[in-house]
């Protein structure tokens, strides 16, 4: 259900509030362009600056707008176990198809603390849980052994978004679990290398603006057609890189605005607009790929 190309959706704002119609348009855009699933309220969706009410509203609106035409994965992780459980229960209640659970950030739990955190969430909910390992943001790395333990102990822990930048993690995780475990790349630049050794797809930033291409690359990789998939990977390599020229989601939201996919380039502080020099670099790559004029 969650194989292939999953978009880490940007959150459109307008006049300081959630742009409901903008969100609806983005969801339709991804349905029309072959995206396999949508993550809302993740890192790319600016979840840290959403109010609790906005977080719930975003999930509920996405579920309603999708109307079961595309799976919705709700970002409901937190560094408070109680808060993560509460938000995950809400996502389950309103009909989200899965939950993305980030490793607790800032408070830097031990591996046993990470296990106990996700154990509590898994025991309190029934929704499929995709764990999210991104040590560059959280300050702690969930080791493959910890994930494997959770995967083996709780049937609703179905997979992991692996954003360590380490392709070997795929093989390590498979060796501790099985070939069918859901591993999703958390880095567009590493999607194809990770799929070559057993990952099942990507939770993608670039998919916000090139959904057809990312979807096709993942489809080819899942079919074992790596030579064809490699052509797409290499063609968009410069785009994958420039989208991280500043902190995500600043460049991708700027690109979406320049392409007319969102009406307002609103970022919430402490995120701030791109520097002029970096924006020009972004525009240059977008023009090269005929995404803007």
UniProtKB/Swiss-Prot annotation:
Keyword line: Amino-acid biosynthesis, Cytoplasm, Diaminopimelate biosynthesis, Lyase, Lysine biosynthesis, Schiff base
InterPro entries: Aldolase_TIM, DapA, DapA-like, Schiff_base-form_aldolases_AS, Schiff_base-form_aldolases_CS
Annotated localization: Cytoplasm
Annotated positions for site Part of a proton relay during catalysis: 43, 106
Entries under SMART domains matching the protein: DHDPS (SM01130)
Biological process annotations from GO: diaminopimelate biosynthetic process; lysine biosynthetic process via diaminopimelate
Annotated residues for binding of pyruvate: 44, 203
PROSITE patterns: DHDPS_1 (PS00665), DHDPS_2 (PS00666)
Catalytic EC class: lyase
Pathways involved: Amino-acid biosynthesis; L-lysine biosynthesis via DAP pathway; (S)-tetrahydrodipicolinate from L-aspartate: step 3/4
Major localisation: cytoplasm
Lipid metabolism as UniProt keyword: no
Catalytic activity, EC: 4.3.3.7
Catalytic reaction list: L-aspartate 4-semialdehyde + pyruvate = (2S,4S)-4-hydroxy-2,3,4,5-tetrahydrodipicolinate + H2O + H(+)
SUPFAM superfamilies recorded: Aldolase
Gene3D superfamilies assigned: Aldolase class I
Gene Ontology cellular component terms for the protein in this record: cytosol
A single GO molecular function term of this UniProt record: 4-hydroxy-tetrahydrodipicolinate synthase activity
Positions annotated as active site in the UniProt record: 132 (proton donor/acceptor), 161 (schiff-base intermediate with substrate)
Protein purpose: Catalyzes the condensation of (S)-aspartate-beta-semialdehyde [(S)-ASA] and pyruvate to 4-hydroxy-tetrahydrodipicolinate (HTPA).
NCBIfam families (alphabetical): dapA
HAMAP family, alphabetized: DapA
Family to which this protein belongs: Belongs to the DapA family.
Quaternary organization: Homotetramer; dimer of dimers.
Protein name: 4-hydroxy-tetrahydrodipicolinate synthase
Source species of the chain: Sulfurihydrogenibium sp. (strain YO3AOP1)
Lineage: Bacteria, Pseudomonadati, Aquificota, Aquificia, Aquificales
């Amino acid at each position: 259900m969650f194989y292939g190309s999953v978009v880490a959706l940007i959150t459109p704002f307008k006049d300081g509030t959630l742009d409901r119609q903008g969100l609806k348009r983005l969801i339709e855009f991804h349905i029309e362009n072959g995206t396999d699933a949508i993550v809302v309220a993740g890192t790319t969706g600016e979840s840290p600056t959403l109010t609790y009410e906005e977080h719930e509203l975003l999930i509920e609106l996405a579920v309603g707008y999708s109307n079961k035409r595309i799976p919705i994965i709700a970002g409901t992780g937190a560094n408070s176990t109680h808060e993560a459980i509460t938000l995950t229960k809400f996502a389950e209640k309103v009909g989200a198809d899965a939950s993305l659970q980030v490793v607790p950030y800032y408070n830097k739990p031990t591996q046993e603390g990470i296990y106990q955190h996700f154990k509590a969430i898994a025991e309190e909910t029934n929704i499929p849980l995709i764990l999210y390992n991104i040590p560059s943001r959280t300050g702690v790395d969930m080791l493959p052994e910890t994930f494997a333990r959770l995967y083996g102990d709780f049937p609703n822990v179905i997979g992991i978004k692996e954003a360590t930048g380490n392709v070997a993690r795929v093989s390590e995780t498979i060796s501790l679990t099985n070939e069918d475990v859901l591993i999703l790349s958390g880095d567009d630049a590493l999607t194809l290398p990770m799929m070559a050794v057993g990952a099942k797809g990507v939770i993608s930033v670039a998919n916000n603006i090139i959904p057809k291409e990312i979807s096709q690359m993942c489809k080819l990789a899942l079919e074992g057609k790596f030579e064809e998939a490699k052509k797409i990977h290499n063609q968009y390599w410069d785009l994958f890189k420039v989208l991280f020229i500043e902190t995500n989601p600043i460049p991708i939201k700027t690109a979406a605005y320049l392409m007319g996919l969102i009406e307002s380039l609103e970022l919430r502080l402490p995120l701030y607009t791109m520097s002029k020099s970096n924006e020009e670099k972004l525009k240059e790559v977008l023009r090269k790929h005929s995404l803007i004029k």
